């Protein structure tokens, strides 16, 4: 049984997502925590990852150097910042390690680096690893094809005060899903802010609104508004554990993949629906 397990390295082990990932890894069948990493200079270096996550000693010591744990993991799970993730990507590409990437806020060059690396290693890259969010994206695709051409489309998202990028990666994924269903490019139809005398709403655009407040884990709504009616599709996360479980489910799914770039729709088989 042990030989069949996937060993995961968790980057950002001391962060909110990192601790959830450690907890989830201990309870998910087929997953073995292999390594835990934090940035150089962190006060958490040398700590036991299990104690850090509040689950007791597990014998995995928090390190800062991937090279020291190269032989301890099969899949690296990364929910950090773009600059750090790209450095980890280069390491994994060099050493043939698969990756699950939940980091958001990449520019186009960063996204291209991920696409390039996926020619050699297997990567699941998703804006959101919640099963519910990815089901929502499928619903948005279907709704956009039916209502999108004659409704006003708005995306509203809310997150905690510590989130540093806006709109959220999930909100952008929602916009891209809707735009693609309407044979549009999101860059050509997105409206990210409104202030002052804006004039009437431009038909065919997709608006975005962002809230940053308190400890909101994540709330996303897409509104399709027509005269006399509107459809709203909403997802609300109440625990980060849903993202952690989805990420580790992705790591298990990568077991049979040699290379390629995938997302949660692939992991969940949503494209066949």
Curated annotation (Swiss-Prot):
An annotated GO BP: diaminopimelate biosynthetic process
Catalyzed reaction equations: (S)-2,3,4,5-tetrahydrodipicolinate + NAD(+) + H2O = (2S,4S)-4-hydroxy-2,3,4,5-tetrahydrodipicolinate + NADH + H(+); (S)-2,3,4,5-tetrahydrodipicolinate + NADP(+) + H2O = (2S,4S)-4-hydroxy-2,3,4,5-tetrahydrodipicolinate + NADPH + H(+)
Pathway named in the protein's UniProt entry: Amino-acid biosynthesis; L-lysine biosynthesis via DAP pathway; (S)-tetrahydrodipicolinate from L-aspartate: step 4/4
Cellular compartment(s): Cytoplasm
Positions of the catalytic residues: 159 (proton donor/acceptor), 163 (proton donor)
Subunit note: Homotetramer.
UniProt cross-references to HAMAP family, sorted A to Z: DapB
UniProt-recorded name of the protein: 4-hydroxy-tetrahydrodipicolinate reductase
Organism annotation: Salmonella arizonae (strain ATCC BAA-731 / CDC346-86 / RSK2980)
């Amino acid at each position: 049984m042990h030989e069949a397990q996937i060993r995961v390295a968790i980057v950002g082990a001391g962060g909110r997502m990192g601790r959830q990932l450690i907890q989830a890894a201990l309870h998910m069948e087929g997953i073995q925590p292999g390594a835990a990493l934090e940035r150089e200079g962190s006060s958490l270096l040398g700590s036991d990852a299990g104690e850090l996550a509040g689950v007791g000693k597990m014998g995995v010591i928090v390190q800062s150097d991937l090279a020291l744990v190269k032989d301890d993991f099969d899949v690296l799970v990364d929910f950090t910042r773009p600059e750090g993730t790209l450095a980890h990507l280069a390491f994994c590409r060099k050493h043939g390690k698969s990756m699950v990437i939940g980091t958001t806020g990449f520019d186009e060059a960063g996204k291209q680096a991920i696409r390039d690396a996926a020619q050699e290693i297997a990567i699941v890259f998703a804006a959101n690893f919640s099963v519910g969010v990815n089901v929502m994206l499928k619903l948005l695709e279907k709704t956009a094809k039916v209502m999108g051409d004659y409704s006003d489309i708005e995306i509203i998202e809310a997150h905690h005060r510590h989130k540093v990028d806006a709109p959220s990666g999930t909100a952008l994924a929602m916009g891209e899903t809707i735009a693609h269903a309407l044979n549009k490019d999101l860059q050509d139809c997105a409206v990210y802010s409104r202030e002052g005398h804006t004039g009437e709403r431009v038909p065919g655009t997709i608006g975005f609104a962002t809230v940053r407040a308190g400890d909101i884990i994540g709330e996303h709504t897409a509104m399709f508004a027509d005269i006399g009616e509107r459809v709203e599709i909403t997802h609300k996360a109440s625990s980060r554990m849903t993202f952690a479980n989805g990420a580790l489910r992705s790591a298990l799914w990568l077991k049979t993949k040699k290379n390629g770039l995938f997302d949660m729709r692939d992991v969940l088989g949503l494209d066949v629906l």
